[in-house]
Amino acid sequence: VLAKAGANPFVWGEEALASFAEAGEAFGRPATAISVDSEGNVNAPKLKCLVLDGTALGSSDELGALYDFFHPMIRGLGKCGRVVVLGRPTEASASAEVAGAQAALEGFVRSVAKEVGKKGATAQLLRVAEGAEENIDGPLRFVLSARSAYVSGQPIGVSAKSGIANGSTPWVCPLEGKVALVTGAARGIGAATARLMALEGAHVVCLDRPGDEEACSKLAREIGGSVLMADVTAEDAPEVICEALKERHGGVDIVVHNAGVTRDKTIARMKRDYWNMAIDVNLGAVTRITEALLEGTMRKGGRFIFLSSIAGIAGNMGQTNYSASKAGVIGLVKFLEEQLADKGMTANAIAPGFIETRLTAAIPFMIREAARRMNSLGQGGLP
């Protein structure tokens, strides 16, 4: 993957040179072996990425490979660099010893993420299932690219169930010819998502609620997309959305469920309509629309992306309704996983940390400042 992506490769030890020789040189740049002298100095320049294959680590003693590699190398990681460790899913381990070693990788990566975060660098763990090696192209390119700038300390699974094999993905305008639906597209994360997908070649259908026509239409004109105004909680919303997508575009390839609301109060002070609105917009409408799309509107090989939240994982003071709805989204994705795999489709939930949007701007100042500093990078993200 790295050779095909045009990396300027430095490898750990002479024996690793063969791997790059077999893959072919990266645009005429042969791999260079790294060595460390007795004083711990490395014969390599500042590096943008550090990648360690830990899939074969099977005991606590073998975890020393993490120290042996990262102890001398981490000091040479450049600003906004990338650290990636490859591992295996712990549930597939052949023994308790292997399971312990593979589980240890997650704690290591999360800690490294905090250590390198102050210079804008990130660290990720790719858990590659047996037989899924041919599917790592996309995930590995993503975590090493600028697209993952605000993703850090995360274990990411690579499954053998479905996916696109190495080399079959066009990396210039990869979404060319695709139709993408983005809900809540008028501003914030939704607008940024719509712009990115259009930049990568997709025709983006910008969906937002009636009342946001001006902002939504302006965005659609800017990116060459189209507009679909609908209240996602309306009883006929699933039918209206599906009919519009089929009539205008013949279906849809990508759906980003971004529309959401917050109605914050402690459970003791919360009005019932606050509870109902957060649950219905963030979870109920998402479920109904997804089920409708799967009845003939979503094309083969389709992709569902659901916006969850850190609040859905860890909970949050004054957000029982919001946290419940976003945890529900995660449960929905887990349910869909098996159902969609047989159709060549995928479903993933994204739980953003603190993103600077209109919603987070309404959070009290001290809570807002604390939230910005809680993640590995120690800062808020931009949509």
What is each model feature region?
Residues A101-L105, T290, S325, V333:
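Active-site helix of classical SDR
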Residues K114-E115, E295, E338-Q339:
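Alpha-helical segment proximal to the catalytic Tyr-Lys
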Residues N43-G76, C80, V84, V98, ...:
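Catalytic Tyr-X3-Lys loop
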